[in-house]
Amino acid sequence: MTEQAAVLLIFLFVGHFLGDFTPLATARMLEAKLTGSPIGPIALHALVHAVLVGLAVAAIARPVPMLILAAVSVEFWTHLGLDWVKGKMSVRRPGLGDPGQSIFWTALGIDQFAHALVLVGIAFLALM
């Protein structure tokens, strides 16, 4: 792995942390993610992540507009889809929304792993 790839991955993962685990994820966004609706706050949450990805790619990879747009689009749509599906699944299986249940932690791990795979893919494509 090149130094550039390592730095880009670090920026992408720090951005993911900031988007999910700081005040950038508002109470309204978090509430909507619990049930998968309304979609607006989930889309806004995905947009926050997409902007952070765009900034990382522009800063570390290449400031090529089409590359940045592609990275932002991939992040927005995959983040929106993953969070929406997880919310809808939580309605059908209430344990997914309860930190006291082991299934909650399994689902959180799968969710975060899926988001990480998307970020690795974005880094790969950005540095091709």
Cite the ranges covered by each PLM segment.
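Hydrophobic alpha-helical transmembrane segments
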Residues: 1-128
